Amino acid sequence: MTLIRNEDVIQSVADALQYISYYHPLDFITAVNEAYEREESPAAKDAMAQILINSRLCAEGKRPICQDTGIVTVFLKVGMDVQWQGDMALEEMVNEGVRRAYLHPANVLRASILSDPAGARINTKDNTPAVIHTQVVPGNKLDVKVAAKGGGSENKSKLVMLNPSDSIADWVEKTLPTMGA
C-alpha cells in the first residue's frame, strides 16, 4: 500500500503546469533546429529562428511560451493500492494544483476558464476546473500527466459531419477558401 499526501499531488500538478508553460519538449527543439539547418528559404529559416529564440528566452526567464496558457487537461493513472493522506478528493487536489500554478506570483498564467460557459460566462480567474481523465490501474503508484491546450487554433475552425463515403480532402478544398486569412 502506498500512502500519498494531498499536498504532494497538489504541488506536483502545480509544478508540472509551471514547467510546461515555459519549456518546450527537447524533441521539439531538436526537430525545429534540424529543420532550420536544412531549410533553404530565408523567410522560413527566420521564422524557425524566432521560434528557437523565443523558446530559449522563455526557458531562461521562466515565462510562458505563449500568452494562451490553455485549458488544463490532466491524465491520471491511479494504482488500486494507493491510499491518500488527507481529506481532499482527487479532483479537488488536481484543481488546487491548477489554481496554484495559474496564480503563482513569479509566473502568473492567463486564466481563461468560465464557471458557467453556457450561462453567466464568468471567468474563474484561476483556470479551474481542469479536464480530468482518471484510470484505475493495478499497482501502488500514481501517474500524473498534464497538458495545457490553447484555444487560438480554434478561432478559425469549422465542424462538419461527413458521411463515410464523403471525401475529407474535397471538403477541405471547398471550405478553406471561405475562411479568410
Regions found by a protein language model. Give the residues of each.
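Non-transmembrane, aqueous-exposed alpha-helical and coiled segments at domain scale
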Residues: M1-A181
